[in-house]
């Protein structure tokens, strides 16, 4: 499973002009299930996202996670957006191949599982809409952008 994390001051996602998800300071997480992924990869990716220390402490060092933005237990937002294009293979030719992305039904099942698990352990979760044509608006903080990948099975 692949995740692309962006530390944001704020972010929102729109579908057909309607805001379907919005957060203040936190993480925008673009996620993609790959062929062979299961709940195990989703669990590992979520655990890594929530614990990754990419928010600054008082000294300006990246020592805080989205679960503790201020050192006092204040959680940041987590905006989760599905994006199968993260599985693109661009090695040959000029048109990317997406054969490594999970089939739509499996991708949606794992996305829904990932979101449900996130909501079970994190108080501020917003989402996009699976397979929708979305417009994602964000204000990068830093910028800090990190790719994560948990290898399939």
From Swiss-Prot:
GO terms for molecular function: D-tyrosyl-tRNA(Tyr) deacylase activity; Gly-tRNA(Ala) deacylase activity; Ser(Gly)-tRNA(Ala) hydrolase activity; tRNA binding. It is found in: Cytoplasm. Homodimer. Pfam families: Tyr_Deacylase. A Gly-cisPro motif from one monomer fits into the active site of the other monomer to allow specific chiral rejection of L-amino acids. Signal peptide: none annotated. GO terms for biological process: D-amino acid catabolic process. An aminoacyl-tRNA editing enzyme that deacylates mischarged D-aminoacyl-tRNAs. Also deacylates mischarged glycyl-tRNA(Ala), protecting cells against glycine mischarging by AlaRS. Acts via tRNA-based rather than protein-based catalysis; rejects L-amino acids rather than detecting D-amino acids in the active site. By recycling D-aminoacyl-tRNA to D-amino acids and free tRNA molecules, this enzyme counteracts the toxicity associated with the formation of D-aminoacyl-tRNA entities in vivo and helps enforce protein L-homochirality. Its EC number is 3.1.1.96. This is D-aminoacyl-tRNA deacylase. The keyword DNA repair does not apply. HAMAP family: Deacylase_Dtd. It comes from Acidovorax ebreus (strain TPSY) (Diaphorobacter sp. (strain TPSY)). GO terms for cellular component: cytoplasm. Belongs to the DTD family. It catalyses: glycyl-tRNA(Ala) + H2O = tRNA(Ala) + glycine + H(+); a D-aminoacyl-tRNA + H2O = a tRNA + a D-alpha-amino acid + H(+). SUPFAM superfamilies: DTD-like. Keywords: Cytoplasm, Hydrolase, RNA-binding, tRNA-binding. Disulfide bonds: none annotated. It is an enzyme of class 3 (hydrolase). A motif (Gly-cisPro motif, important for rejection of L-amino acids) lies at residues 142-143.
